[in-house]
Amino acid sequence: ASKINADGCHMGQHDGSLLKARKILKNKIFGITCHNSKKLATNAIKNKASYIAFGSFFKSKLKQNAIKANLNILRWAKKNVKKPIVAIGGINNKNYKKLIRAGAKYIAISSFIWDNPKLKPELAIRKFK
């Protein structure tokens, strides 16, 4: 991310040191997936993550063996985390509202947009209005 001067990056739990990433990225946007874990979220906050992501909430072709998360982690985060909360994993236009109601501020919908056999990307995005 720093080599191409990206606005920031998103890291998985096995992508390297959070502290090292923050030092490299300085004031750039930096988020981390915390699966279904309060402990991982707390650690990410201590390491100055810009946002905290939880998931996978639903089955996804992208990461078929992803750790499953439930809505309780979003409810906990809404009460306890001051950073933006992102929901990830198998999200589509029929299941996203329950994630928002539970506490997600943002949703990651890459597979629904880019791997949708029925809709072109622009039309897929419009399904969320």
Task: Give residue ranges: language-model regions.
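Glycine-rich phosphate-binding active-site loops on the catalytic face of alpha/beta enzymes
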Residues: 13-20, 53-65, 96-129
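Alpha/beta enzyme core
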Residues: 3-7, 38-55, 97-102
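Hydrophobic faces of well-ordered beta-strands that scaffold small-molecule active sites
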Residues: 9-11, 30-33, 52-54, 85-89, ...
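Short, well-ordered coil/turn segments that N-cap beta-strands
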Residues: 5-7, 26-28, 48-50, 81-85, ...
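Ampipathic, surface-exposed secondary-structure segments
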Residues: 42-81
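Alpha-helix-loop-beta-strand connector modules within alpha/beta enzyme cores
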Residues: 15, 19-37, 65-93, 126-129
